[in-house]
């Protein structure tokens, strides 16, 4: 039989631990309760049948509905906390004494995750992701193996995709990924028929514009917007630099 709140709190703490076997109980009035118990089905040590633990529940001095809970095993404290009487799922009114078998032991927990709403499939004309490497198109090029390095010029005759990599005209000096050095160094101003390309310019002075100096800014090739400040647009002299006339790259 449970005579008061401190015994009830001790019983509820034991229920929250799991299957326990009470060895002894000792209650001092309505202020403290001491319980020695073993946890059932716990791994045993050599020379002992199971772990013997001790639960101590003490009512705090400043609040009658707050209790200090301490669980220790030997000289080691495994848990120490303060719990409130209202933290447990209990009826609004309790009639003393209580039967131990009729204690509410189910926790009052609400599900944290809710079921996500299933998204409906979009229409056929809804745009998909930006397929800059033509990944979707390459799936329909037959049974030949695909290049495992999309965007690079690494290729083999057995690969279905062409040898040219993505954006070769922009990523490589003078607009080509494999320039022909047999005729000497290429023209630093670029081939007039070339589409241009980015190239490191050690002589370029950093522009004072903030858009040219984002976090982590490094000197070198920068893209100058075709219709922005300093750009000549299509066909003009612009600020093409090494990339060629009007290329937009400086």
Curated annotation (Swiss-Prot):
GO terms for molecular function: proteasome binding. Interacts with the 20S proteasome. Residues 179-250 are annotated as: Disordered. It comes from Saccharomyces cerevisiae (strain ATCC 204508 / S288c). One of its GO terms (biological process) is chromatin organization. Keywords: Chromatin regulator. Disulfide bonds: none annotated. Pfam families: PI31_Prot_C. Plays a role in the establishment of transcriptional silencing boundaries, preventing the propagation of heterochromatic silencing. Belongs to the proteasome inhibitor PI31 family. It comes from the Eukaryota. Present with 358 molecules/cell in log phase SD medium. Residues 229-250 have a biased composition (Gly residues). The keyword Ion transport does not apply. This is Silencing boundary-establishment protein FUB1. Residues 202-213 have a biased composition (Basic and acidic residues).
